[in-house]
Amino acid sequence: MRRGGTYIDATVGLGGHSYEIAKRLGAPGHLIGLDKDPAALEIAKAKLVVRRSSFVVGQDSSAGVSPATSDWPKITLLHRSFADLENDQRPFLACPELGEGTIDGLLADIGVSSLQLQDAARGFSFQADGPLDMRMDPHSERTAEQVVNHLDERELADVIYEFGEERRSRRIARAIVRSRPIRSTAHLAEVISAAARPMNFEPRRIHPATRTFQALRIFVNRELDDLKALLEAAPRILKPGGRVVVISFHSLEDRIVKDAFREGSIKDKYFRVLTKKPLMASEEEQDRNPRARSAKLRAAEKV
């Protein structure tokens, strides 16, 4: 990291990564945090408020800004998707000093957070009963309930297969259509479990509904499209020597990141790949944080 530089945490979440970046960044640095989830931004705000700085977390394209102090960077929190970095310039309207080629580093920790998984009312998990929602941004229109109850059988099977890599997608989709209407996570998990007998190659610890819930979440939130947009934006907004770091948690995400970095280094020649193989969590880290077992970190530098 370059002390006093400008960095983006594209998935600020609960503020853990942002806090560590801010500690190392210092003044007169600038940290911009983006997240779709306003509830997560409120938690991050509390974590990042130091030296009596104050925040007003921004809605839409407006910002919550903490001024820099002698040893703490300016911090701007935006309720925006990181896909907007490619789609338009709205995230930067609150940061007029920023523009193309001005960012020293960009971090994205892709996927659902522990906070979202543990809140039954958000509908991300089959571990507790809740409404079929699955929206990271509660202001977005499409919910998992709408997908489950309104897509036709073929479309639903395609979603489950493409985004969940679920080989039993057609059987599961057929069972879902026959069981409509489905309003809760528990009901959906029950339908999937009855339709999807475990395959011989699957570890017994994987619940039959795991891949289908993943597929619905990715589809509802357009996660892969957003990731592609972020990777397209990175070479435009980074300075020469600026770095993009992406942490992913399943093969679909990792494949997109790997391909984007490889294409950017070979075909377009605007990236230098820093991680020939993804970095994985140590055994110690996995013991502290079991979710880290599936995490893969890749990094590239703009040339």
What is each residue range found by the language model?
Residues 1-51, 70-95, 99-303:
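S-adenosyl-L-methionine-dependent methyltransferase catalytic core, i.e., the SAM/SAH-binding region
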Residues 58-59, 96:
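Prokaryotic Sec-type signal peptides and long signal-anchor helices
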Residues 53-55, 61-62, 67-72:
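Short polybasic linear motifs
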